[in-house]
């Protein structure tokens, strides 16, 4: 009881009187007639003590205020002048910078420049908090993946790039496009990082919560002394890891030159729209997320794999003139498993084609009869918590064998049929499961788009493939292993809306 009494020295005494309040009249009278063995407790219970936050010592107030969200502290400063003075304590704001934004730097060095932790929180971190996370730039059909993070005492926008074609298993590359930091007490400084001449003056405008734009105020820093030819050669080495002479395919050369001309005209003056990572569910086939995939002459692109009940969808985060960013590149029917033939028969393209086209005919007949799932019309998630993938009657007798092989961990032998091209020959030779799916193909400029049948091949938790039947082409996808902060959708509905928005921009 003595411990409780000491605690109540900084608060109302009612907490120590609970025992007395719970007694009946007889117990109270008996207790009053007994001598209390704790004089300190007797003094506290004898008279009601009143105490407020204003009476607490400054050290305790600092601890209390430092544990509150930074957004609540301005209201406390308006209570009284004492609170306002205490809230100038840098310890409070150092803790808020660390707990809310992960700033673990030694902030004491800021004292040299006259910038306080309070300035860092209010004028840098809190002011630009809405641009943290993942974004897709509006660069025509090409798109992109921007990750804005707090990095020490900077906020940096990193553009994530796929590895050089065709090394889909290599880690992602990234380069800074802009940074924000606090040089003086007045305001934060925005710098453009584009080009090869170092940081220079830039500007950021937050259009709305899920959209912002960047502008370079010194685009001459993007130019090189050797003119456009030197700029193109440098861009080609960074983008493709090779020279134009190394690329013998004429159509591929045209695509590369077209991308350089189109993307370089923006000069880092771009509009970005927020994207979210897909929500996961325990019944998902594999963990959803971002993957790098091979797309023939277009090189490597970034695709977001998400699950929607009995279907999985791959949405392009980066794109090309045929299928632009934001479009749904593949859709997989998780209720239609495909049992591959043995390796010898699998080498025969006609045999695999026969199996896939039989499934497509079943789908067509069911849709016409109204028995099967309705045709896909939009990327909205109608049933985000739908049933897990399982064998269906339409999948044929091989579905049970596929399920057994997946649970046993043995897998199925896999080899590409003769005549099927692949940018990367280093694909796994065993797979866990195969499903019927469709892929989106179109002419240049996204003309005459249509969905064509194919086979989704699941290799493991981090790799899958898609065999484009009509194109006789195989795309290999490998998971992006980077960790992204501030990228989770606030709700499944918000993720659905994001998919609709990025698709509508290029439809």
UniProtKB/Swiss-Prot annotation:
Q: Which residues bind Zn(2+) per the record? A: 192, 200, 216, 222
InterPro entries per the UniProt record, alphabetical:
F-box-like_dom_sf, F-box_dom, FBXO31/39
Q: What's in the domain note?
A: Zinc-binding is required for the structure of the protein and facilitate folding.
PANTHER family per UniProt: F-BOX FAMILY PROTEIN, F-BOX ONLY PROTEIN 31
Q: Where on this chain is D box (motif)?
A: 50-55
GO biological process, any: positive regulation of dendrite morphogenesis
From start to end residue, where is composition biased (Acidic residues)?
33-42
The gene designation is Fbxo31
- Residue interval(s) of motif DDL motif: 283-285
| Known pathway | Protein modification; protein ubiquitination
Q: What biological function has been recorded for the protein in this entry? A: Substrate-recognition component of the SCF(FBXO31) protein ligase complex, which specifically mediates the ubiquitination of proteins amidated at their C-terminus in response to oxidative stress, leading to their degradation by the proteasome. FBXO31 specifically recognizes and binds C-terminal peptides bearing an amide: C-terminal amidation in response to oxidative stress takes place following protein fragmentation.
- Could you tell me the keywords of this UniProt record? Cell cycle, Cytoplasm, Cytoskeleton, DNA damage, Metal-binding, Phosphoprotein, Ubl conjugation, Ubl conjugation pathway, Zinc
Entry's SUPFAM superfamilies?
F-box domain
What's the source species for this entry?
A: Rattus norvegicus
- Could you identify this protein by its name? F-box only protein 31
**Record PTM:** Phosphorylation at Ser-264 by ATM following gamma-irradiation results in its stabilization. Phosphorylation at Ser-448 in absence of stress promotes its ubiquitination and degradation by the SCF(FBXO46) complex. Phosphorylation at Ser-33 by AKT1 promotes association with CDC20 and ubiquitination by the APC/C complex. Ubiquitinated by the SCF(FBXO46) complex in absence of stress, promoting its degradation. Ubiquitinated by the APC/C complex following phosphorylation at Ser-33, leading to its degradation by the proteasome.
Post-translational modification Phosphoserine, affected residues: 33, 264, 448
Q: Name one GO molecular function term.
A: cyclin binding
